[in-house]
Amino acid sequence: TISSNHWMMAWTGLEINTLAILPLISKSHHPRATEASTKYFLTQAAASTLLLFASMSNAWLTGQWDITQLTHPTSCILLTMAISMKLGLTPFHFWLPDVLQGSPLTTGLLLATLMKLPPISLLLLTSSSLNPTLLTLMAIASIALGGWMGLNQTQTRKILAFSSISHLGWMTIILLFNPKLMLLTFLLYCIMTIAIFSTLNTIKTLKLSTMIAAWTKIPSLSATLMLTLLSLAGLPPLTGFLPKWLIILELTKQEMTPTATIIALLSLLGLFFYLRLAYCATITLPPNSINHMKQWQINKPVNTIIATFTTMS
């Protein structure tokens, strides 16, 4: 998909991408995993159909199959909606929390990072053809809804799903003005998300209630998890603050100060649940003291991955 310049090849790449992840989502054979894989398949198939319809209608009207030659207004709107559905932007976000909740943490990591690369590459290739008003409205709505819906969640995977929706809003709002900044934001988001998912997979935490006992068992890992969460929230002087600051700066240069102010205020909603995750991971203790050995060092290969990505984030 990334290297394609013909719509049929890009569509084929997206379909292969979708079919490859389905066995990983449903490998546990749990009813929730089956439901998640069904939702993912139906949503991605609908988005691919919409994408194909947009490219075919443009080819019918203009005679062009080249990705960069999408010029018809109707096709541009359909393309914007199709890629938004692929990524999980509001109002096409409905599938992402349920699919992440029904998937294992390792598969959820792939869904939140690597599986977003083909749609984001299509966004970059077709940025001149996208509808700017529609894209900006969906980006602001994603930042708002990602922060708002994450407030009352107790499942860590759903919290990270709404975090992903919110960060997608930050990426898409800057796409039309500075594509390189969008790539930087996506790269840093992937690094921080890999560190968080790997840590949660190591301490076997799926709920906030089970995260409370993490500090008594693995204090060093819980401390690094707190730093990564605060970086994902965008608190200075951590790494996650840099892309958000640069995005607000770029929007101000483009005379979009009201938009920059709105998304800066909406990011405070997300800050609350990041702080709640960090609070549960480090400050809270279980009600009953259990005498056991603290696992300061765990000899597992995944620890090298966690340490590397935590340092980078």
Where are each of the predicted segments found?
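Core, highly hydrophobic multi-pass alpha-helical transmembrane subunits of bioenergetic inner membranes
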Residues: T1-S313
